[in-house]
Amino acid sequence: MKQLALCCLLGLGLVAMTLAEDAKNDATRKDRMLLEGTWQVVSMEVNGEKSDPADARKLSVINGADGIWSLRSEGQEVARGTNSLDASKSPKTVDLVPLDGDKKGELYLGIYEINEKTRRLCFAPPLMARPTEFATQTGNQWIFVTFERVKPK
C-alpha cells in the first residue's frame, strides 16, 4: 500500500512538473510571437547616460520567429545574432549571442518587457551579471533600450 501511495505521489509530481514546464513554454512562445517583427529604438541609455534621441532613432531591430535578430543603423545591418527568452522569470530574461563580428559567440545577459506596441530591454556586456532592473547607472555598463513596434506597410 505504501509503495502504491509513493508511486501515485511521484506520478502526481511528474504531472505537476510537466504542467509547470508547459506553462513556462507557453509564456515564452507567446513572447516570441510578440517579439517577431521590426522594432524602432525610441530611447537608449548606456552606463547611466541617455543617448541623443536622434541618434537612438537611427537604430532598429528586426526579430525573426526563429530567434534570429538583425540590428540596423539607418537601414543597414550592423550586427546579427540569436536570442533565447525565458518568460517564466521575473523580470523576464533574455540571452543574446552575436553571430558575427568581433563579439561573435559572446553572451550578453538581459531582461525584457514586451507588449503589442512597445518593449524594453536592459542588458549587460559579456562576463557581467544580468541586470536586475530597467535602468542604468554610471559604472554598471548596462544598456537600456526602449523600442516601439514598426507597423507593417
Where do the PLM segments sit?
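Secondary-structure transition motifs
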Residues: 127-151
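Hydrophobic alpha-helical segments
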Residues: 16, 54-57
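Contiguous, well-ordered beta-strand patches that form the walls/edges
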Residues: 29-30, 36, 41-53, 64-136
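Amphipathic/hydrophobic helical signal segments and adjacent flexible N-terminal regions
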Residues: 2-50, 146-153
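Short edge beta-strand segments in beta-sheet-rich domains
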Residues: 56-58, 107-109, 139-144
